[in-house]
Amino acid sequence: MGWDLGTRLFQRQEQRSRLSRIWLEKTRVFLEGSTRTPALPHCLFWLLQVPSTQDPLFPGYGPQCPVDLAGPPCLRPLFGGLGGYWRALQRGREGRTMTSRASELSPGRSVTAGIIIVGDEILKGHTQDTNTFFLCRTLRSLGVQVCRVSVVPDEVATIAAEVTSFSNRFTHVLTAGGIGPTHDDVTFEAVAQAFGDELKPHPKLEAATKALGGEGWEKLSLVPSSARLHYGTDPCTGQPFRFPLVSVRNVYLFPGIPELLRRVLEGMKGLFQNPAVQFHSKELYVAADEASIAPILAEAQAHFGRRLGLGSYPDWGSNYYQVKLTLDSEEEGPLEECLAYLTARLPQGSLVPYMPNAVEQASEAVYKLAESGSSLGKKVAGALQTIETSLAQYSLTQLCVGFNGGKDCTALLHLFHAAVQRKLPDVPNPLQILYIRSISPFPELEQFLQDTIKRYNLQMLEAEGSMKQALGELQARHPQLEAVLMGTRRTDPYSCSLCPFSPTDPGWPAFMRINPLLDWTYRDIWDFLRQLFVPYCILYDRGYTSLGSRENTVRNPALKCLSPGGHPTYRPAYLLENEEEERNSRT
């Protein structure tokens, strides 16, 4: 066995050497002006007749591995390397034998991009990469198909190798990061190495770095000698950028700081715009298990083929759906056809008219509901009137919302947010919430709290202890506060005699308690949240109807049931039939 393996290795090496000699001879004939030069495409086809079967000793070698066919440097500028030519041939063959996605654009229209994110801090988890999302989304809006994203360390050789690979494969290459004055900013050097170039000071960049003032910025003026400078307009100021975007061939070198990168790309969109292509997309939300609808999705993709791309993405954290479907096409027609196709085949009622931007569109949706004249709409209108009165009497710095992650205060926060959007759209102050931390909170509740802070752009005022102790601490640390909005309902303990505006009792820290939801019921709260697709704590979908700490909160026995497989489980809180059993979750 060992002798046979050695023999086959030797034979394979001899075969590779023979192909290399043939390649060099054909290249010499071409460069010397042979009469066969006009037949170059045929010559290239002949040269590409490498073994098409997989080699058991080298399974990566052959048509799937274009490295050996890259060709000499003198031909790469003409043909992008024979590896690129081979890949084009392979794509043509695959198109006849494989089901294609809509992302494979029509020949002649396709503009592609590869993104290289540079930085040890990304690979080590020190910094979260947000540039990739922005670059992919923006390029797609410009008609550019992003084919590959790579994250590489601050190493010259590694960056150079990736730049070389990407430059030969894609229309545009965008790098992000590694541009600056420090030792680990090596992107300029790496790109120079990738193209056999050298770093030289550029007069315009030298002037720009001097304008920055101080010392240590000289490194920014050292760019590959073949670099081009692009001066765009800053979308934030309307003024020309002080520092240009540097490019070398088809590689564009962006800063890694997200704020700068976004401004530069917004100001340089014209460099990448592909007017021949406009991508169209649609998102569908399905309240069904992904495995159960997988056959339907496979049939749909096979039915529409190259006309449309269908993606399926499960979401275990959503209150409203289990799977998000994305439909992508270069034309609107296939999207509508696929929507009708899926509507007719997915489980009845599983498509959810979900609004992913419920917080951003809160004002429009909440006030529309308030003006609907429905029973719930009248409750919403009454709550908004109380909130608007409080906004007239107090400034935002004097108000805060009592928030513990429960359903009632979640509804209240959404109402308050909508009213501020409508009445004070230009006020920059973030909304304030008072969070009284319990001794042993649910991790899911803590996560929901953090998500809510980001979602609504909140400032959290944190306190501990009983309500009285927390209000005292709040008053001492934030003396400007005068009123707290509460999600109290009359059915809550000791709340039947409250008014919309109720001062705290004697002996308590002096605050005005504002109660917009006094006349709401358990069903009103859930109808409001679910109709407007307001995110709420996931524990409510697991059988909890009233949330406290882990010591005093259990799933509501009234929601216990059997799953389709016969296992005990719990229905979500919004399906509780008897509202009087709401507090059965508390022990």
Swiss-Prot record:
Modified residues (Phosphoserine): 106, 563
Required cofactor(s): Mg(2+)
Keyword Nucleotide-binding: yes
UniProt lineage: Eukaryota, Metazoa, Chordata, Craniata, Vertebrata
Enzymatic class: transferase
Modified residues (N6-succinyllysine): 378
A biological process term (GO) from this entry: riboflavin metabolic process
Stretch list, region FAD synthase: 398-555
Family: In the N-terminal section; belongs to the MoaB/Mog family. In the C-terminal section; belongs to the PAPS reductase family. FAD1 subfamily.
Reactions that this protein is recorded to catalyse: FMN + ATP + H(+) = FAD + diphosphate
Presence of keyword Transferase: yes
Disease per record: Lipid storage myopathy due to flavin adenine dinucleotide synthetase deficiency: An autosomal recessive, inborn error of metabolism characterized by variable mitochondrial dysfunction. Clinical features range from severe cardiac and respiratory insufficiency with onset in infancy and resulting in early death, to mild muscle weakness with onset in adulthood. Some patients show significant improvement with riboflavin treatment. Analysis of skeletal muscle show multiple mitochondrial respiratory chain deficiency and a lipid storage myopathy in most patients.
Enzyme Commission no: 2.7.7.2
SUPFAM superfamilies tied to this protein: Adenine nucleotide alpha hydrolases-like, Molybdenum cofactor biosynthesis proteins
Annotated spans, Molybdenum cofactor biosynthesis protein-like: 114-205
Residue interval of the organelle targeting sequence: 1-17
Cellular-component GO terms for this entry: cytosol; mitochondrial matrix; mitochondrion; plasma membrane
Name used for this protein in its record: FAD synthase
Biochemical pathway: Cofactor biosynthesis; FAD biosynthesis; FAD from FMN: step 1/1
The protein's role, per its UniProt record: Catalyzes the adenylation of flavin mononucleotide (FMN) to form flavin adenine dinucleotide (FAD) coenzyme.
GO MF annotation, one: identical protein binding
Superkingdom, natural source: Eukaryota
Residue list for modification N6-acetyllysine: 378
Keyword terms: Acetylation, ATP-binding, Cytoplasm, Disease variant, FAD, Flavoprotein, FMN, Mitochondrion, Nucleotide-binding, Nucleotidyltransferase, Phosphoprotein, Primary mitochondrial disease, Transferase, Transit peptide
